[in-house]
Amino acid sequence: MDVGELLSYQPNRGTKRPRDDEEEEQKMRRKQTGTRERGRYREEEMTVVEEADDDKKRLLQIIDRDGEEEEEEEEPLDESSVKKMILTFEKRSYKNQELRIKFPDNPEKFMESELDLNDIIQEMHVVATMPDLYHLLVELNAVQSLLGLLGHDNTDVSIAVVDLLQELTDIDTLHESEEGAEVLIDALVDGQVVALLVQNLERLDESVKEEADGVHNTLAIVENMAEFRPEMCTEGAQQGLLQWLLKRLKAKMPFDANKLYCSEVLAILLQDNDENRELLGELDGIDVLLQQLSVFKRHNPSTAEEQEMMENLFDSLCSCLMLSSNRERFLKGEGLQLMNLMLREKKISRSSALKVLDHAMIGPEGTDNCHKFVDILGLRTIFPLFMKSPRKIKKVGTTEKEHEEHVCSILASLLRNLRGQQRTRLLNKFTENDSEKVDRLMELHFKYLGAMQVADKKIEGEKHDMVRRGEIIDNDTEEEFYLRRLDAGLFVLQHICYIMAEICNANVPQIRQRVHQILNMRGSSIKIVRHIIKEYAENIGDGRSPEFRENEQKRILGLLENF
């Protein structure tokens, strides 16, 4: 209730039900006194309301006056007050350290100084509202002192420091003053903040709420710093953070917010970072990720938060598979078998497992995984997904386009990498049941060709408008248009056309005839397919070397000669 509600509140006292023999008498009395009573009641009511209004005004005046006094008492935060605060902090920190050394076995002697130290650390939170003054924390060595306290014998003090650092590094605050933020982050990195934070993490007991909060705030510091300065991720991972995250993920503890946060930070550390991906592989991290994900092969996550953690772990695994050495570890760790099982079980994890398989098989580095996938009867799993996109796919946030993109990419990788008997087994799938899989391939071809024609028409219109306005269409603009076309469906269409070229070059007349027959029926032509494949070859990346790109382009264009 606000002040007005408090003053106007009247409790419901209820009414007394009259006995039968009193009813008539009361009716007569009411008739006689009704008019007089109503008049008197209105007068009394007005008096009560006026008194209540007066009380309300007086109370509001007192509250306003107290608020003004509090505002007057608050000292404005400026350079001088921050310096004074830092000096007090340094004095209390030194005093506590001195008393702990002097009376190591007598906590009563240093306990008061510890409380004083904790109080000043709490007061320093106000500095987080003024990032322009962060330079004072560095110039007066407060940052170094705070980092030193991360190893304090009393974890309450180290947790208080973590809480303060988390607020100082809040990403919104850092962006308020780039200069102040740079100075602070430089000092933290120079002081090896991540190594000190990890040492503190090692001794925290998450069964104690305050210490569990300390773990959460520590992870927040890492996330804030990684977002502001992504290059510190490599150094941070090497200072023990990556190892601690893996240990925390595999710890036999119930799922909680900290485990979710660990999965988020892990995904951040691995993003576009080959050094961290290699380090994770060396720390047996691929096995840890597979073990954690194996829980979801037959069971769906029980909460939205647990599903988010699962997706973070899948993202981390996909990121690691960008590195060829990790694909070997994935193969040895029976990752293919786990993903194949997830595809068969039809749980929420299925769409993410499909994405992992795509990453594991792509390019020449995926050759061993492609052969193993056929050996474990993976073709029986992947082709039903090719023939029909799952109905309930929207519930897990994966679009039909994404599903078809991954399936077509996997088939393209299999056709590229398989040799001998396994390749024959794959090609035979396209002749089964009156070439139904060729029919499905052509159905997808026309679906995405139509989407591309719509996108191309829109882009051509935009180009025409730019020329009319006298704007130059440079390489950057062309690249932007190309990326838009890929997103609109060109990426899937390129894989579909590549699959068509591969299977038509396989010396299986039945397949080639069916492809040409359907193209003619739909009024399309080989020229369109050739053009799409040529564009695909021209835009292949360097991969590991320019030589790889050149050889791959020759191989793909060679498929067109017999198409």
From Swiss-Prot:
Gene3D superfamilies: Leucine-rich Repeat Variant (1.25.10.10). Residues 1-49 are annotated as: Disordered. The keyword Cell cycle does not apply. The modification N6-acetyllysine is found at K91. Keywords: Acetylation, Adaptive immunity, Coiled coil, Cytoplasm, Disease variant, Immunity, mRNA processing, mRNA splicing, Nucleus, Phosphoprotein, Repeat, Spliceosome. GO terms for biological process: adaptive immune response; mRNA splicing, via spliceosome; positive regulation of apoptotic process; somatic diversification of immunoglobulins. A motif (Nuclear export signal (NES)) lies at residues 130-140. The modification Phosphoserine is found at S389, S545. A motif (Nuclear localization signal) lies at residues 16-33. Component of the PRP19-CDC5L complex that forms an integral part of the spliceosome and is required for activating pre-mRNA splicing. Participates in AID/AICDA-mediated somatic hypermutation (SHM) and class-switch recombination (CSR), 2 processes resulting in the production of high-affinity, mutated isotype-switched antibodies. PANTHER family: BETA-CATENIN-LIKE PROTEIN 1, BETA-CATENIN-LIKE PROTEIN 1 NUCLEAR ASSOCIATED PROTEIN. This is Beta-catenin-like protein 1.
